[in-house]
């Protein structure tokens, strides 16, 4: 019986993996600035980039790119909508929606890996990822604001659903086209 161990063949966090995560962190930051201001929560394209991160980077890497985004925001880098940053933006009433980006990317990626990366498969994965994000964010908002859950959902989610449908359709279309190209190029 040999006691020799297998040679080390590489890290889960290779330079390529870290670079792709950094690119998607930057993409979320840029898409966060493309915004339409509304009273409660601004509409922006951040979730569009979150869906792409989940669908293209898969669960853990997609979530990692969002963890880095939140860490940058927490230390004050102005990566959030309206060039805001700082811990106060993450722990306020609507901070749960931003923290929910991590879960949205993870679940979108998990379901995309499990079901496949065709357009309709990605649409369903992104809808469920969005639902996880919205559940987490609405629960957070409800607890901090003292508003009942369904009232919070009606105020903070329902008005944004039409835009989310468009974001999901565009992100699924783009991801279903990009994934084979990125795989052929060895980037994923």
Where are these regions (language model features)?
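Hydrophobic transmembrane alpha-helices
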Residues: 2-63
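Short helix-perturbing small/polar motifs within transmembrane alpha-helices
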Residues: 3-8, 23, 30, 87-135
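Interfacial aromatic-anchored transmembrane helix boundaries in multi-pass membrane proteins
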Residues: 32-42, 70-104
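Hydrophobic alpha-helical transmembrane segments
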Residues: 18-23, 48, 52, 62-68, ...
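Membrane-helix interface segments
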Residues: 14, 59-64, 115-121, 148-149
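Interfacial helix-loop-helix junctions of multi-pass membrane proteins
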Residues: 77-83, 140-154
